[in-house]
Amino acid sequence: MGVTKKPDLTDPILRAKLAKGMGHNYYGEPAWPNDLLYIFPVVILGTIACTIGLAVLDPSMIGEPANPFATPLEILPEWYFFPVFQILRTVPNKLLGVLLMASVPVGLLTVPFLENVNKFQNPFRRPVATTVFLIGTAVAIWLGIGAALPIDKSLTLGLF
């Protein structure tokens, strides 16, 4: 929590404390040594202890053992790879699919240069960045949902 009160340097009590080297008590606790030597290690070690405790008391099983003679019909990646998987699955040329995936970060890197005259942080005053974000989010969700569907319904999501 930050200090919101500015010190009054004309206050004789504060001036006496500052002369004795006790000024930090007026402003709050110092970060060194209290936070860095006592509070942070307790939080870090407590987090590690909770993680190890959960791993020992409730271990997560990896899953059922693999059966090499029973392959599923369609192998899907993890959910966060669904949009990329959908691009590779629907684009006929694999090189074009890889170039499409590489164009996403390149396109995102060009957004600040397209809108470099706008110094505002309010998203409503940055229409290019807001439009790129909204369209990119909609496309990523569309591709992610489509990747979980069969290939014939993947682009239309079965709606059309």
Swiss-Prot record:
User: Cross-referenced InterPro entries, in alphabetical order?
Assistant: Cyt_b/b6_C, Cyt_b/b6_C_sf, Cyt_b6/f_cplx_suIV, Cytochrome_b_C_euk/bac
Q: Which Pfam families does UniProt cross-reference here? A: Cytochrom_B_C
Coiled-coil annotation: which residues? none
Keyword annotations: Chloroplast, Electron transport, Membrane, Photosynthesis, Plastid, Thylakoid, Transmembrane, Transmembrane helix, Transport
Give the bilayer topology: Multi-pass membrane protein
**Which GO CC annotations does the UniProt entry carry?**
chloroplast thylakoid membrane; mitochondrion
Care to name a GO molecular-function term for this sequence?
Answer: ubiquinol-cytochrome-c reductase activity
Q: Where are the transmembrane segments?
A: 36-56, 95-115, 131-151
Subcellular location as annotated? Plastid, Chloroplast thylakoid membrane
According to its UniProt record, which protein family does this protein belong to? Belongs to the cytochrome b family. PetD subfamily.
Subunit record text: The 4 large subunits of the cytochrome b6-f complex are cytochrome b6, subunit IV (17 kDa polypeptide, petD), cytochrome f and the Rieske protein, while the 4 small subunits are petG, petL, petM and petN. The complex functions as a dimer.
- Summarize the protein's role: Component of the cytochrome b6-f complex, which mediates electron transfer between photosystem II (PSII) and photosystem I (PSI), cyclic electron flow around PSI, and state transitions.
Q: Which HAMAP family does the record associate with it? A: Cytb6_f_subIV
- Protein name as catalogued: Cytochrome b6-f complex subunit 4
